[in-house]
Amino acid sequence: MNKLRLVLIAALMIITAANGSRTSVAQEQPSKRLPLGAVKPALDMRSLEGSAAPTWQDLRGKVVIMDFWATWCTPCIESIPHLNGLKKELADQPVSLLSITYEPGAKVREFLKTHKMETDIFIDNDLSTFKSFSSWGIPITYVFDGEGRLVAGVSPKNLTAEIVRKILAGETPLLKEHGGWDDPAGAAKYFREQLEEDRKKFGSN
C-alpha cells in the first residue's frame, strides 16, 4: 500500500512539473495583441525629429490613437490616406494620432518622399514599444480614452471619426476587434531581422 502511494505521488509530481514547464514556456511567448483594459505600456520611443515621446500624463484628457505600421507593409500603406483623413476630420478635437514604426528614421524619411503622412510619426528602434503593446499583426491601431483606458484594438480602416467622437463622449462603441497575429513569436523574430538589415543600410537613426 505504501509503495502504491509513493508511485502515485511520484506520478503526480511529474505531471505537475510538466504542466508547470508548459505554463512557463507559454508565459515567455509574446501575446497576439494587447487586451482591452490592459495597463498602459510605457511609451519608449522618439519622434522622427529625435525628441522624446509624450508621456501618458501629457496625453491625459485626450483620446489617443496609436497606429503601428512599417514601410514594407502593404495594408499599412493602404491605410495612410484613411488615417490622414481621420487626422484632418478630428483636428478640432482633443485627439492625438501617433504612427509608430520600428524602422530607422532615415528609412522612414526616404519613404515620406513619396508618401504623405499627416499623423505624428514615432520611431521605436529597439522594438520595446512593439513588444509592450504586442503589435505584431500590423497594421493595428489601439485607442485609449481620456482616462488612459484601452477601449479598442482594431485595423485602422475600421476606425472612423464617428467612433472616436463616441469615445470622446464617454461611450464604448462595439467594434470589430483586431485578432492579433497567430504567430507573434515568429513575427517578432522577423521584425528583429528586418531591423538588423535596415540598420546596415540606413544606420540606427
Protein language model annotation of sequence segments:
Residues 1-8:
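Bacterial N-terminal signal peptides that target proteins for export
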Residues 93-107, 117-127:
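Thiol-based oxidoreductase modules, predominantly thioredoxin-like and allied folds used
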Residues 14-23:
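C-terminal segment of classical bacterial N-terminal signal peptides
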Residues 111-118, 124-168:
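Thiol/disulfide oxidoreductase modules built on the thioredoxin-like
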